[in-house]
Amino acid sequence: MSIAAIILAAGRGSRAGSLQNGPKQYRFLGREPVICHTIRCFLQHPAITNIILVIHPDDYQICANAIADLKDHLTIIEGGETRQISTLQGLRALKNVKPNYVHIHDGARPFIGNELLEQIHTSINHKEGILPVLSVSDTLKYVSNTHHVLETIPRTNLYRAQTPQCFPFELILAAHEKAMQSHKQDFTDDSAIAEWFGIPIRTIPGDPNNIKITWPADLETARSYLLKGMQIFPDIRTGNGYDVHSFEDGHYITLCGIKIPFEKKLNGHSDADVALHALTDALLATQGAGDIGTHFPPSDPQWKNASSEIFLHHAIEIIKKAEGRIANVDITLIAEKPKIGPYRHIMTENLMKILKISTDRISIKATTNEKLGFIGREEGIAALATATVIYPGEIPK
């Protein structure tokens, strides 16, 4: 008995996050992308003889990078505009192999338990499809277009379908070909096509851990599940930043985006916010992304008198693109004058709004230089900043 698997990874759904971070199947889950976990579930099962990975035409490079160590163990083909077309492409790619049975699986389900595969394999026969299902526990409501409840749907005999769904190969191929010839393309899964074609579908108990990553919260759930029973080192990075500016004649200085009345101002190309400059460098350091001068050269006139919050937002966007989460920032201001204490609260509140973290994760403190050096002579202010950012995955071994 030969069993093949088709893994569908051609989707372009954006519900699990912005596509600027890549399709969900290539987002990191632990030390490798979601799709790698999915592939390994089938590779590690001895009964699976062939694996077809169906990807989006634009994803050949990102896929090659993601599955570099696995690509020799499967066949990669180009999918179509819909899930149904992609499945048919995968089935056609197996026509020369002619397996007895074929699994059809969502690439965004990375936790297929070996027990579930075994249960499917002991249940398969040449006449039926096998569908893992979970009972519906929530109360179901039928809602109108105006968001009003029309009726409550009884939960009896209602189930949620999972993948992998397993079918006799020749039957499911014929069903998909017939659906395409009939221009029937409104099916949401393969068991629905099988039902329409007349293939009996037998259900077996699904696995609650076999989640599909659809929404942003699902990625966090998946990461938590992966951590269970595993001793790994999360990818927590720390960056440091330092900046200094001299005084010149003026009426206020800007620190952490807050204007503080003073008989002088800080001299600089931008608004010379020494605190935000140091913090921006600290955040950039967690991505190895250079320093503030790399991104905003002081020789560029467009940054003359610019708000340093622009620089900070830029660093935050770089972190967001890498799916990082700012966990903590610590800023030390070194100055004889002015007194920072009266403004610490409002400075912290401003950083809270910019960084989108709670105030207990923000530390702003000040010290003098004990009358030593240029700071002791009241010629300027220096700032030290440390930032801690958590990124998905773990420290590479």
Curated annotation (Swiss-Prot):
Residues the entry annotates as binding a divalent metal cation: 243, 245, 277
Region ranges (2-C-methyl-D-erythritol 2,4-cyclodiphosphate synthase): 237-397
Catalytic activity: 2-C-methyl-D-erythritol 4-phosphate + CTP + H(+) = 4-CDP-2-C-methyl-D-erythritol + diphosphate; 4-CDP-2-C-methyl-D-erythritol 2-phosphate = 2-C-methyl-D-erythritol 2,4-cyclic diphosphate + CMP
E.C. code: 2.7.7.60, 4.6.1.12
Molecular function terms from GO: 2-C-methyl-D-erythritol 2,4-cyclodiphosphate synthase activity; 2-C-methyl-D-erythritol 4-phosphate cytidylyltransferase activity; metal ion binding
Reported cofactor(s): a divalent metal cation
UniProt entry tagged with the keyword Nucleotidyltransferase: yes
Residue span of region 2-C-methyl-D-erythritol 4-phosphate cytidylyltransferase: 1-236
Classification via InterPro entries: IspD, IspD/F, IspD/TarI, MECDP_synthase, MECDP_synthase_CS, MECDP_synthase_sf, Nucleotide-diphossugar_trans
Annotated site location: Transition state stabilizer: 15, 24, 269, 368
Pathway: Isoprenoid biosynthesis; isopentenyl diphosphate biosynthesis via DXP pathway; isopentenyl diphosphate from 1-deoxy-D-xylulose 5-phosphate: step 2/6; Isoprenoid biosynthesis; isopentenyl diphosphate biosynthesis via DXP pathway; isopentenyl diphosphate from 1-deoxy-D-xylulose 5-phosphate: step 4/6
BP terms from Gene Ontology: isopentenyl diphosphate biosynthetic process, methylerythritol 4-phosphate pathway; terpenoid biosynthetic process
Family to which the UniProt record says this protein belongs: In the N-terminal section; belongs to the IspD/TarI cytidylyltransferase family. IspD subfamily.
Functional description taken from the UniProt entry: Bifunctional enzyme that catalyzes the formation of 4-diphosphocytidyl-2-C-methyl-D-erythritol from CTP and 2-C-methyl-D-erythritol 4-phosphate (MEP) (IspD), and catalyzes the conversion of 4-diphosphocytidyl-2-C-methyl-D-erythritol 2-phosphate (CDP-ME2P) to 2-C-methyl-D-erythritol 2,4-cyclodiphosphate (ME-CPP) with a corresponding release of cytidine 5-monophosphate (CMP) (IspF).
Name of the protein in its database record: Bifunctional enzyme IspD/IspF
Organism (species): Bartonella bacilliformis (strain ATCC 35685 / KC583 / Herrer 020/F12,63)
